[in-house]
A protein has these predicted regions:
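Soluble FAD-dependent oxygen oxidases
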Residues: 2-490
Length: 490
């Protein structure tokens, strides 16, 4: 069955209802989570028909052949069944879908790239605003500005801007959506030089829960602009983002992979290397399983003169990596090389922030990785350079203190493996907690009020007040949620 447009939907819904002898209600209620449950009105054929008649995009229900593909998200640990998915064609579709979900008292999810660690882009038994068809990117080379629709992926933004030798901080995985990335802060290979993705956001078009289409910028709704630069999708549905671009052409990029057995020495060398590295140097370390034992891999991307970049890498190459793939390439090539998870898979990931990689912290990390299941890893992301020179209260994104983000993750394909992975990830986080002081909300595979507060630190109280203004009923709650009725103390 084809996707449902407003023209085709009237007869399709009537036929389906007659055939199955039942209303087209929230069939996705199978497996509804406690967080998603609401006493919503059933979605019968007439309700869906009326919705489709006002939508320029496509309306997808459990009866359409595209339903399973449309509800599929990157983290296959979540298998959610929404009652209806609205693949929006523009802001007006977003506004109409927001109104529909609230009128029917149904849970509402917003999907752009579909990479949420907690599967927030889908919900059980509710309504999904799907932005994936809105992915146009326009580049103004004179102003060095990109204007991108919220369904664009990192690869869409990079491909459009690299045609002109330009780029902005946009994450390290090509299939991540730029909207979720940016709204949560946005780490990437250029953050040491040019700041986080949210630091390069010039303005955004937002549909508020009451259906208004507004601009968020330093001059228009500045409180909203402050909040969406790190505060996630708590305040409205962003439909367009405008970014500052920078000249980025050739980079020195690749990885140094070392033999097993030298993780503590290599991490100490990594810390020393970073201390003398300029802002042009992005580097992160991965602690990986292998048949020979745990090993360390250092990924680098240097956006300055490649000859100088090679000179800077001499201390790391002195440890004789068994594989050295670092070479000069286009920034686009570096960006499309892949990320931690190259393909959709069931996974669990969490993180914490460390102010330093002390000897004790390195020992704890080494012990953890030596005990890790074969499908688990840890990633050490330095927080330094331009991203750490922004005042913590200038944006909602609070990761401004120099230090390290430790991402702890694992994948599985059986229930037994899942239990082992989750147990190790949680135990590793707990063991590193004495060295930690916060979290990055975009990389959390679990959620709680305490974790959300920890992610926003001194900005939490202001975020609560802005949430009360723009979404007092917490319609947009399937996210790392800032509750409007939260006590504002941190």
């Amino acid at each position: 069955m084809a996707l449902i447009t407003r023209r085709r939907f009237a007869w399709q819904t009537a036929f389906a209802a007659a055939l199955f002898g039942c209303p087209l209600r929230a069939l996705g209620s199978r497996g509804v989570s406690d967080a998603d449950k609401q006493n919503g009105a059933p979605l019968d054929a007439e309700a869906i028909r009326k919705l489709a008649s006002h939508i320029d995009g496509n309306v997808i229900t459990p009866e359409t052949s595209e339903y399973d593909a449309a509800r599929s998200i990157f983290n296959r640990a979540f298998d959610r069944h929404p009652a209806v998915i609205v693949r929006c064609a523009g802001p007006s579709d977003v506004a109409r879908t927001l109104e529909f979900a609230q009128t029917k008292h149904l849970p509402l999810a917003v999907r752009a790239g579909g990479h949420s660690r907690l599967g927030f882009g889908m919900c059980d038994g509710g309504v999904v605003i799907d932005l994936s068809a809105m992915k146009r990117v326009e580049v103004d080379t004179g102003k060095r500005v990109a204007r991108a629709e919220a369904g664009a992926l990192v690869r869409d933004l990079d491909t459009a801007t690299q045609r002109f030798g330009l780029a902005t901080t946009s994450g390290g995985c090509p299939t991540v959506g730029i909207a979720g990335l940016t709204l949560g802060g946005g780490e990437g290979r250029l953050m040491e030089k040019y700041g986080a993705a949210c630091d390069n956001l010039l303005s955004a078009q937002v549909v508020t829960v009451d259906g208004r289409q507004v601009e968020a910028s330093p001059k228009s709704n500045p409180d909203l602009f402050w909040a969406i630069r790190g505060g996630g999708g708590n305040f409205g549905v962003v439909t367009t983002l405008e970014y500052q671009l920078h000249p980025v052409d050739q980079v020195l990029s690749g990885a140094l992979t070392y033999p097993p057995g030298r993780i503590p020495d290599l991490l100490q060398a990594f810390v020393k290397f970073l201390a003398g590295a300029p802002d042009e140097m992005d580097a992160f370390a991965q602690l990986l399983p292998s048949e020979q034992g745990r090993r360390l891999k250092i990924d680098v991307c240097y956006c300055g003169d490649p000859r100088l970049g090679n000179d800077l890498l001499r201390p790391l190459r002195a440890f004789k990596p068994q594989d050295d793939s670092v070479k000069t390439m286009s920034y686009l090539e570096a960006q499309t090389a892949g990320g931690f998870l190259a393909a959709p898979v069931a996974h669990f990931q969490t993180n914490l922030l460390l102010r330093e990689l002390s000897g004790a912290a390195i020992a704890a990390i080494t012990t953890a990785i030596n005990d890790a299941p074969a499908t688990c890893k840890a990633i050490i992301v330095p927080l330094r350079g331009a991203v750490s020179r922004v005042n913590v209260t200038d944006t909602a994104f609070a990761l401004r203190e120099p230090g390290y983000e430790i991402d702890i993750a694992g994948v599985w394909n059986t229930p037994a493996a899942k239990a082992e992975v989750v147990r190790w990830v949680q135990a590793t986080r707990d063991n590193l907690q004495p060295f930690g002081h916060g979290v990055y909300v975009n990389q959390l595979g679990d959620t709680s009020d305490q974790l959300v507060r920890s992610g926003y630190g001194p900005n939490y109280a202001r975020l609560v007040e802005i949430k009360k203004k723009y979404d007092p009923n917490n319609v947009l709650r399937l996210n790392q949620n800032i509750k409007p009725d939260s006590a504002s103390n941190t």
